[in-house]
Every structure is written in C-alpha cells, then in structure tokens.
Amino acid sequence: MNLDIYQKLCSESKILWTQHCLQRMQERDISRADVKNGIATGEIIEDYPDDYPYPSCLIFGYNVNGRILYIVAGCDNINIYIITAYYPDTKKF
C-alpha cells in the first residue's frame, strides 16, 4: 500500500474509527489528532496486503508532541480504517 493514499485520505478526514479502537486509544492516552499527525508524518514499515476485509499496514509516525506512534490501518482507497494505535515499547529496542 502506498502511504500517499493514506495521507490524502487523512487530509480529507476520510477516517473511520471503531468503538474498540477509540476505547483503546483513550486507555493509551492517544487522541485522534495524534493518529492523524502520525499518518501525516509517517512511513509504512510493514505491509499486510492480504488482510481482510482491506489491505492494511503498520505506520511509524509521531504524535502531536513528537512521540513515536505506531498505527495499524486498513484502506479501501475511499476511507482509512483505523485498527489500532499504540506507543511502541522502546525497552525492546
């Protein structure tokens, strides 16, 4: 998947959020603005072309305060579907 389509759809606010995703984001203190910024500043680090119902990817980006943020999202070229967003465990690196 091409990051350009994610960034275009993000700039057009064509993002769909599940209740589960929003709940987990709240638990992790991640805002919608953080996710949008992560997509805008990000790069795709893993691609999942066979995911169902839409191809998805892992995006490495930054929240609005410059903290590293990972976003898993799918795309049907009409909307972005946010699957989850989380701060990586930097102790593993």
Predicted regions and their residues:
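Ribonuclease/tRNase effector modules and their secretory precursors
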Residues: M1-F93
